[in-house]
Amino acid sequence: MAEKDATASGDDAIRVSGMQFAYEVEDPIFFDFNLDLPAGSRCLLVGANGSGKTTLLKILAGKHMVGGKNVVQVLSRSAFHDTQLVCSGDLSYLGGSWSKTVGSAGEVPLQGDFSAEHMIFGVEGTDPVRREKLIDLLDINLQWRMHKVSDGQKRRVQICMGLLHPFKVLLLDEVTVDLDVVARMDLLEFFKEECDQRGATIVYATHIFDGLETWATHLAYIQDGELNRLSKMTDIEELKTSPNLLSVVESWLRSEIKLVKKKKKPVAPWKPSPFDNSPFRSSRHMAYYR
């Protein structure tokens, strides 16, 4: 059961009520999941790998249908059914890298000999002043050729394009992982201004906690598909005695790992089979997957 503060109200920017979700032929990821975030908040979404953070963000972004129209609401509208949320730019999602799935090779980076200018100026209906501000903020060279630049430079262009339209709710999934420290801190300051000046709401999933103690207003901790904790940053008792947020989250995750190990059933020892040396049981060379 999550520890919640008293911020839930009719003015919530995000409201999830009794959500259940599972991928096809798999066990449920979320069961009776609830989340309420007020407008203007900056919420850190933390948890171990595989806890459900990315899936939750995609559900909030309207990429997965769950339950009825009132189960997942963003700005008092159905995240999945109200497509105008995304089309208008009110709801924006930034996550993952520019990649495509190619056969059994998995995901590979998108390739294309086009400039950053071509991509950024190709987004229609944008404010030129906001566009120039983002280009300057992210230190983007409009002459960059996108098939030649680094992952961090590609990420800057991706972020710029995703922020060109003023958002009301922004969902971020590890978008700063490729950025250097200066670009990351400048971007976080921009997000803070968007919340303070325009009342925007941000949910930010990350494993990099430097400088976030004073940036975030709320923290949501997901443990194995459950909302273990939801509280204001000022109400987290551990932060008052710990040197930083990293130490606090680390202690939570280590406790979680110990609990999982206690519940884990012992694995039966491997026994050789007479068929192991059979030519019909050979495996592909690992180079196939490189």
Swiss-Prot record:
One GO molecular-function entry: ATP hydrolysis activity
A matching Pfam family: ABC_tran
Primary residence: cytoplasm
Induction profile: By sucrose.
The keyword Repeat is annotated on this UniProt entry: no
GO cellular component, as recorded: cytoplasm
Domain (ABC transporter): residue spans on this chain: 14-249
Domain of life (superkingdom): Eukaryota
Compartments, as annotated in UniProt: Cytoplasm
Positions that bind ATP: G47, A48, N49, G50, S51, G52, K53, T54
Keywords: ATP-binding, Cytoplasm, Nucleotide-binding, Transport
Protein's name in the database: ABC transporter I family member 19
Organism: Arabidopsis thaliana
Taxonomic placement: Eukaryota, Viridiplantae, Streptophyta, Embryophyta, Tracheophyta
Gene name in the database record: ABCI19
